């Protein structure tokens, strides 16, 4: 069981090696002002929107 987990971790690490840093930043949203969405009144962090959409579920 432990060997299969190690092999899985190695496979994931190999996949990450194929991703360029610019591609990773684009996928993670790092190029977009670090998660801040500019609005008319102020900058809302993405966590604010996530809370609003998940607070009542």
From Swiss-Prot:
Q: Where is this cross-link: Beta-methyllanthionine (Thr-Cys)?
A: 39-44, 48-56
Query: Which InterPro entries has this protein been placed in?
Result: Lantibiotic_typ-A_Lactobact
GO molecular-function term, one example from the UniProt record:
signaling receptor binding
- Provide the residue ranges of the propeptide in this protein: 1-30
Say where the cross-link Lanthionine (Ser-Cys) occurs.
41-55
Q: Which stretch is the leader sequence?
A: none
Q: What is its main location?
A: secreted
Q: Which family does it belong to?
A: Belongs to the type A lantibiotic family.
Keyword presence, Zinc: no
Q: How is the protein modified post-translationally, according to the record?
A: Maturation of lantibiotics involves the enzymatic conversion of Thr, and Ser into dehydrated AA and the formation of thioether bonds with cysteine. This is followed by membrane translocation and cleavage of the modified precursor.
Tell me the keywords, alphabetical order.
Answer: Antibiotic, Antimicrobial, Bacteriocin, Lantibiotic, Secreted, Thioether bond
Residue numbers bearing the 2,3-didehydrobutyrine modification: 54
* Coiled-coil stretches: none
Temperature-dependence annotation = Retains 50% of its antimicrobial activity after heating at 100 degrees Celsius for 100 minutes, and retains 25% antimicrobial activity after heating at 121 Celsius for 15 minutes.
Q: What does this protein do?
A: Lanthionine-containing peptide antibiotic (lantibiotic) active on Gram-positive bacteria. The bactericidal activity of lantibiotics is based on depolarization of energized bacterial cytoplasmic membranes, initiated by the formation of aqueous transmembrane pores.
What name does UniProt use for this protein?
Lantibiotic nukacin
A Gene Ontology biological process noted in the UniProt record is:
defense response to bacterium
- Where does this polypeptide localize? Secreted
Native source species = Staphylococcus hominis
Give any Gene Ontology cellular component. Answer: extracellular region
